[in-house]
Amino acid sequence: MARSTTATAQTGGLSLETVEDLFRRLEQLNEIGAALSQEKDTGHLLEKILVAAKAITRADGGTLYVLESSDEGPRLRFAIMRTDSLGIAMGGTTGSDIPYYPIHLSGKDGKPNNQMVAAYAALTDKTVNIADAYSEEGFDFSGTRNFDKKTGYRSKAFLTVPMKNHMSEIIGVLQLINSKDPATGEFGPFSHSDQRLAESLASQAAIALTNRQLIDQLERLFKSFIALINTAIDEKSHYTSGHCKRVPELTMMLAEAVNETSDGPLRNFNMSDKDRYELEIAGLLHDCGKVTTPVHVVDKATKLQTIFDRINLLDTRFEVLKRDLEIAALEQKIDLVSQPSLEKVDARDRLGQIEQKLRESLRRLESDREFLRHCNVGREFMPPETQERVKQIGTGYQWTDISGGTADFLTQDEIKNLTISKGTLTHEERETINHHIVATIKMLEALPWPKHLENVPEYAGGHHERMDGKGYPKHLTREQMSVQARVMGIADIFEALTAKDRPYKRGKTLTESLNILGHMKLDGHVDPDLFDIFVRKKVYLRYAEQFLDPDQIDEIDESKIPGFAADPA
């Protein structure tokens, strides 16, 4: 079986190339190489490779195959197809899918698929230059002939070039069809110069494609490491398991809305794809410092919770008090009935008094017990009189422990926790929680960020700052913060307000959340211009439709939102 692995016709059907033409095409090749190295999108890069190869060899048509793995073994996937004279353009930026099955490099019997010219080039790492497919006996061109029969085309000359990466591994195949004579417009074979130019281009293209694939793989690996960190954080706390995913989503929604703004103070804010990627990475890493936060603080669902809920200790103490009261009452009754001189009527009255006092004491105990259980649940606000009652209960009862010693019913630490005015965290615990942003900044600033990601620490580290400088940890003002950091601040707050997985509160409705956020604008907490865009562009609604429960999405009267400026300033 004949194998055409070099040019079978170097000049047949084509005029001899002039030296000037060859130099022109070499210059074109150099320009193409430079252009390919600058392309950032893999799909666009594949398209540029084929279009450039067609131009430099004057091919009417061509296909670019990409080698990929499958359950049946390696195969060549149709990535880009072009045939100028038929107006065919599929794959790439066309949005038109290529309706052809991939070419497997081996058959079902495991033998090499040397019948298909593209597979043969990939398997042998050899260029195949065929002058006339209709007279070629070495390969199976039945599919090509069927295509020609349907379209009236004649696929005559084929130039098939393997593409190798820096490790000499085949990554794809470039196939060109029908070289067009610039003088006559007729189709003919590819010359030896065409082949050398195509091979040179394929080599440059393979390097550019490999670089792009390596960059894409590294970016995917980098994101996977970030996802790994976020998974660890989510596993620590099922109460905030979605926070690390939702904040980046809302951050990008608001950033895009600002990017689309053509008037107002933020009209000059523009994001490139690089800027978007940088902000996305910052959003994904904004809480990475939470890996250092103790889980019993992160998950503190009640005020008395440490590694367990200490309310059960209080229940035990109440049972001890109840037992002591009942024992004391029984002892009084026994002492009473043991007095022989006591008249029956008087004894009955005194026994009734003992029983009545016991019932009243037990009712008071049960009332105080339920009261403390109620206080143990974190709420929006605990009034001073409620806090005072906790303190009275704490020191008003004395209980006897197993060693026989007596102590106040509540320890000072328990009183401190039960009188937390808002939520479930003490000041010290809140400082521990807040320390996660310090840890985040330290962790991110320790990394050797490339130039296109150098702002990640600033973006991620500023979402707890306030516009008036009263935030933490650096007490930055609005003027000291980037727009991106301020965007993330709003996203972080709104997500927390609407989150339905917090242990001490329900997820708020849109109206409630926007009212709180509006007051935060007036109070100098969040950026006023970003807040107005957040409402005006209905970013809150897009987020709600994706992440909130239906009962949280109520009707919004934007005119009643505190501080909202309906029209751009």
Where are these regions (language model features)?
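Divalent-cation-assisted or electrostatically stabilized phosphate/pyrophosphate-binding catalytic cores
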Residues: 189-193, 229, 299-324, 414-444, ...
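Regulatory loop-to-helix N-cap segments in sensory/regulatory domains
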Residues: 2-18, 140-141, 149, 153-154, ...
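Helix-loop-beta substructure at the N-terminus of cytosolic sensory domains
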Residues: 30, 38-92, 111-117, 240-241, ...
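Regulatory sensory and allosteric helical modules in signal-transduction proteins
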Residues: 86-156, 400-401, 419-420, 426-427, ...
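GAF sensory/regulatory domain recognition
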Residues: 63-112, 135-136, 174, 284, ...
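Signal-transmission linkers at sensory-effector interfaces
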Residues: 1-48, 55-56, 214-228, 410-413
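A short, aliphatic-rich beta-strand micro-motif
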Residues: 156-172
